[in-house]
């Protein structure tokens, strides 16, 4: 499982039936790979909930999202598992099939909520317009395999 965390001043995701937005917090781009499990979702959710990605008065990254009253916008993105080894068109066979991936994606979002975080989401498996106003920028990539951070 791969999650790209971007610290944002604001972010939104929209399509014909959806309009979710947050102010200060994280925009998460969430990729579910063939071997991703609920254990991977748990360890990444814990890391994100406790990650100190906001500055204190000395410009040190010392505050987590809860301490800053931030929100999370979680957007599924199967393209994080693109295979670009051959040719010019990416392949996506490394991504988990959608029926299984959506369950892990929803589980991951619920795991974040279990830490008391406000989590808004995109719509799994649909085309969306994502707007991200990065803050910093601060971008961290979390990856887990077999329930362990890589």
UniProtKB/Swiss-Prot annotation:
Entry GO terms, CC: cytoplasm
Which InterPro entries did the record assign? Daa-tRNA_deacyls_DTD (IPR003732), DTD-like_sf (IPR023509)
Enzyme class, top EC level, equals: hydrolase
Q: What does the record give as the reaction this protein catalyses?
A: glycyl-tRNA(Ala) + H2O = tRNA(Ala) + glycine + H(+); a D-aminoacyl-tRNA + H2O = a tRNA + a D-alpha-amino acid + H(+)
What positions does the record give for the motif labelled Gly-cisPro motif, important for rejection of L-amino acids? 136-137
Task: Give the residues annotated as coiled coil.
Answer: none
The subunit field of the Swiss-Prot or TrEMBL record says:
Homodimer.
- According to UniProt, the name of this protein is D-aminoacyl-tRNA deacylase
Q: What is the lineage of its organism?
A: Bacteria, Bacillati, Bacillota, Bacilli, Bacillales
